[in-house]
Amino acid sequence: MANLDLIVRALRAQCPGLEILEHEPMRAHCSFRIGGPARALVRPASAEETAAVCRIVRDGGAQPLIIGNGTNLLITDGALERIVVQMGDNMAAVTQPDATHLSAGAGIPLARLAQAALGCGLAGLEFAHGIPGSLGGAVSMNAGAYGGEMKDGVGSARYLDGELRLCEAHGSAHDFGYRHSAFSDTDCVLLGSTLALTPGDPADIQARMRDLSERRRSRQPLDLPSAGSTFKRPVGGYAAALIDQAGLKGYTVGGAQVSEKHAGFVVNRGGATFDDVLRLMDDVRSAVLRTSGVELEPEVKIIRG
């Protein structure tokens, strides 16, 4: 078993400018507001520092846990014996290399990136304005909403491969699918992406963003902690409709509840635990399988420790 104390000491010695938060409560870093203390959370400030951090952690016998805004995570509320590498504001720069492209770091929130596109008069990211995640996670899972997906705009992605070599993917190498990419469930670490967008009228772009934001506010439980859509969309249907048909709107386990506003969301009504959410998700999957014959697949990523 890896000695995380030794790894933290090595990080301090070999990466002197690295931001390191020891025994950091993960509930502060995920939108479910559930999560126990991680042995350490670190925030690298460059591709080189990210590679150095990951190499030190791996050389110490551990596997780094890479996160962004934590908007698609359910994390154990016990001690998390991991070194968490957060791609945050230190990796969130955005530039415009030419008239139709934006290049941004993996840590930039999608809302900020969409606003940057608006400011440059570029269309194509309106759908992403209300998605609470960051660019790295969004590209990795090909996040989408209201008819748009990240695959529609990603021209290239910069990443560290399994050997921590700096690489760049283009075109079909991204292997985008529904809530999937070539980076999903791999050891690759996304560093940033260049997006190919379309010139547009800023007034039209802003109007579209406002329309989608209003639709989200009216249909989704944005006033309660959640991880967004809890289950992936099954072939030929919608998870929310199947859950509603099973009579589970408002179904509660401890502090976790199937949202009364949108059955596709599991929300934290206050004091929900990791086990509350897991039990509720299991109950929902069992009920939907029984009533509809459909096996729902979690969209939220579960971190058990």
Give the residues covered by each predicted segment.
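Short acidic/polar capping segments at secondary-structure boundaries
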Residues: H101, I108-L110, G130-P132, G136, ...
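Short, basic and Ser/Thr-rich N-terminal targeting/leader segments
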Residues: G60, I67-N69, G153, L224-P225, ...
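Structural signature of FAD isoalloxazine-binding scaffolds in flavoprotein oxidoreductases
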Residues: G35-G36, V42-A47, L74-A92, V139-G171, ...
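Gly/Ser/Thr-rich helix-start
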Residues: G36-P37, N69-T71, I108, L122, ...
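Phosphate/pyrophosphate- and phosphate-bearing ligand-binding catalytic cores of soluble enzymes
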Residues: L21-E22, L73, L160-D282, S286-G305
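Anion-binding (especially nucleotide phosphate/pyrophosphate-binding) glycine-rich loop
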Residues: A2-L135
